[in-house]
Amino acid sequence: MWLHFDVMANILCHIRGTKRFKVYPPTDITKLSFLPSASSSTIENPFDPELEPDGVHPMETVLKPGDVLFIPELWPHAAYPLEPCVAVNVFFKSLEHGYSSGKDVYGNKDLAAYEKGRTMIGRISKGFERLPSAARRFYMERLADELANMATDG
């Protein structure tokens, strides 16, 4: 299974077969090759050690019949079946209806606020297009730093 994240926490109930399961903390997201507005990574095989990015902190286990695994929201994860498997995921509806910009069947569609923010950033970026590159970089990095500080200040 591809490397992806879900916006809602879920429980994976493993019923039959065995599979490797790998999960990364949300702090690794910028190192895992997620394109903007994508909940799936471009890493082709997250279980290939040659493709593992530097500086990530994966946790890995092997799931067997009867195992139950809690997967927190926004934790990138992937599964690799070692034989034919059956599993069931149950998602926690922790977000209000309308949290995403469209229908979210699988619990991995980005938040509407994020999509709106990406649109706003695009508009802001256009305002800097005519500046010399040094000034553009200087002020856009200042804005990025301010935005990062807002995220940590809550």
Language-model segments: residues:
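Active-site region of the double-stranded beta-helix
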Residues: M1-D67, A78-G154
